[in-house]
Amino acid sequence: MLSDILRAVILGIVEGVTEFLPVSSTGHLLLAERFFDLGDTNFWKSFTILIQLGAILAILALYFAKLWRIALGMFSDPAAQRFVIGVLVAFLPAAVIGALAGGYIKSYLFNPWVVCFSLIVGGAILLWVDQLDLQPTQDEATAFPLPMYLYIGCAQCLAMIPGVSRSGATIVGAMLLGADKRAAAEFSFFLAIPTMVGAFVYDLYKNRADMTMDHSLIVAIGFAVSFVTAIIVVKSFLAYVTRHGFTLFAWWRVIVGTLGLIALALGK
């Protein structure tokens, strides 16, 4: 039991730290499962699905006041209505492709080799974008032009490849389309809510036969750790990238991906 609790804490930290950073939570969880020797058990696969809800609730908690104002204004405030429509438009491409090709992607791309290569390539792209002399024209995540929301949603589809990073794809897409760093990161958080809830419900339904109450304590620990860690990380992340950009996270990706490839090549 103690070893399972330790694994739950580690995976909860990995999920909470990486979910909203441009480093790929799915990729890190896959590597953690591989190198911590969790085995190919149905429980641990289900566990990594369930703890995502902790990270989702962290965003809802942090942005509750703003999201509540938007919800109240959905039927009377044009700005709130436009933002809600924008989020739905951005969510749509991933929902469609996920429904059509999600099974294929998980069957053929969810392996450590793909993750490591994706981490390295994504890190190189993040380094490149961070060095560009971009001139932002959008500084408010809730007021992007409607076509911009759609293009960001299309960029998010790249994150279906494990190791690419959902937040990384949406942040890079938003910045190239004119958003400043803070607005790009904030919209990535907002878009995470329907995207992650949709993925959570879909995966939960597909794996419903493996969900039992036998490991409820382990799941509760992972959930709580993910929630608390995500809150700390999101608050720190916005302040950091506003001042320093994404270079640290780009090198993080490259280093983790390279070390992963070396370990895989050595048969670890």
From Swiss-Prot:
Primary subcellular site in the record, as a coarse category? membrane
Question: Which reaction is the catalytic activity of this chain?
Answer: di-trans,octa-cis-undecaprenyl diphosphate + H2O = di-trans,octa-cis-undecaprenyl phosphate + phosphate + H(+)
Single GO cellular component annotation? plasma membrane
Q: Name one Pfam family in it.
A: BacA
- For the protein in the UniProt heading, the enzyme class is hydrolase
Q: Name one GO molecular function term.
A: undecaprenyl-diphosphatase activity
Membrane topology term reads:
Multi-pass membrane protein
The highest taxon in the source lineage is: Bacteria
Annotated compartments: Cell inner membrane
Enzyme Commission number, as recorded: 3.6.1.27
Any extra detail in the entry?
Answer: Bacitracin is thought to be involved in the inhibition of peptidoglycan synthesis by sequestering undecaprenyl diphosphate, thereby reducing the pool of lipid carrier available.
Q: Which NCBIfam families match?
A: PRK00281.1-2, PRK00281.1-4, undec_PP_bacA
Q: What's any GO biological process attached to this entry?
A: regulation of cell shape
Q: Which PANTHER family match?
A: UNDECAPRENYL-DIPHOSPHATASE
Its gene is uppP
Q: Which UniProt keywords apply?
A: Antibiotic resistance, Cell inner membrane, Cell membrane, Cell shape, Cell wall biogenesis/degradation, Hydrolase, Membrane, Peptidoglycan synthesis, Transmembrane, Transmembrane helix
Q: What does this protein do?
A: Catalyzes the dephosphorylation of undecaprenyl diphosphate (UPP). Confers resistance to bacitracin.
The entry's protein name is Undecaprenyl-diphosphatase
Q: Does the keyword Transmembrane helix apply?
A: yes
Similarity annotation: Belongs to the UppP family.
Task: List where the protein spans the membrane.
Answer: 47-67, 83-103, 109-129, 144-164, 184-204, 217-237, 246-266
